[in-house]
Amino acid sequence: MGYTKAEILKALKGENVKFLRLQITDILGVVKNVEVPESQFEKALDGEIMFDGSSIEGFTRIEESDMLLRPDYNTFVILPDLVEDPKRGRVARLICDVYYPDGRPFEGDPRYVLKRQIERLKKLGFDNLYAGPEPEFFLFLRTPEGLPTTETHDRAGYFDLAPIDKGEEARRDMVNALVAMGFEIEAAHHEVAPGQHEIDFKYADALTTADNIATFKWVVKRIALNHGLHATFLPKPIRGINGSGMHTHLSLFKDGENAFYDPNAEYQLSQTALHFIAGLLEHAAGMVAVTNPLVNSYKRLTPGYEAPTNIAWSASNRSAMIRIPARRGVGTRAELRMPDPSCNPYLALAVMAAAGADGIERKLLPPPPIQRNIYQMTVRERRKHKIRELPGTLREALEALRKDPVIREALGEHVYTHFLQAKQMEWDDYRVTVHQWELDRYLATY
């Protein structure tokens, strides 16, 4: 829903809102906010609130740190009581774009990075890129001191019901809070692993979807805290069970119609769809550092846990990196299965859009789809079908990112440089850390 400044001011007064939260994300996808009281509402809506960009990961140097927060009125929402206790004063939220004081958009703002790629697709003649995510998360118990543990709150499995699924009450509160904030929830259920959950919300244009993912993650964490639980979007918190992914369904629309659908083509997939899929395959290795950005991400991308490890596509096969769900017509889409929910949603959707756009611009075509279970294919069979492997570690993913000029250009030089620097430091720290596994394995023997 679109709002005007006058409508927002009226709603703030009518609902007795005391605080307005201005929200952004850093390049790592962590939500940040500046909160202003009633006296500053009009100034905030005029985009005149300044903040120190040098304090935000990947933003600016200290000598050029003044930044402006310009709110997107379409993201206005009054936070429900489940999220913020009204006894302390009602709170509203606006997601902001970041600008320099001279009025230029800040190239290090992840939201701006995504907007650039959306405009690229519009220049190719498309209405927009649409995305539907499936974010998974774990609910863990907390210690008496409030610290998170990796002890699951249940022993339930896929689609199980209470009382086996002890997270059902928390999950319902999450759904109620999200609905109150304008989400259209399609399904909520227990996932395969103990303590693992999924809440699916309706697809939307890419920018709205990125905003929704960022909002979803902090709402889920807040509601979990209300129930004495810790919600984590860490991809693989426990060895030996399924990790958490964020399968993302993608489609392009043109003149109000799904541009991926062609009723007369093989698989009923248009040339546009094939070009887009080919672009995703071409740049899979280069963009995985963005869609799967943690050291821990690559412990999920291993055989045997329903996560892809090979760069391939299929009309139905879930072992492939890209799957084409059965629905056609307006619902024709490509499901990208490797992303995980630790990613920055703006940057992740930006590189997906860039990869697809490159496929369309160069008229790339994918190899034949793989219908067999790729996990059961031999190395020779995979080579025969020209199936490449996804990077197996964050280090390999960063090397692939360095070699992909399309993904680099999509991120922009500022984000590319700061993201790469932060992730290289993360890998270096991990590499020199002595882990418990090493002590358990070697200490007594050597």
From Swiss-Prot:
It is an enzyme of class 6 (ligase). L-glutamate binds at N242, G243, R300, E306, R318, R337. Mg(2+) 1 binds at E134, H247, E335. Binds 2 Mg(2+) ions per subunit. Mg(2+) 2 binds at E136, E191, E198. GO terms for biological process: glutamine biosynthetic process. Catalyzes the ATP-dependent biosynthesis of glutamine from glutamate and ammonia. Residues 110-446 form the GS catalytic domain. It comes from Thermus thermophilus (strain ATCC 27634 / DSM 579 / HB8). It is found in: Cytoplasm. It catalyses: L-glutamate + NH4(+) + ATP = L-glutamine + ADP + phosphate + H(+). The keyword Ligase applies. This is Glutamine synthetase. Activity increases by approximately two-fold in the presence of GCBP.
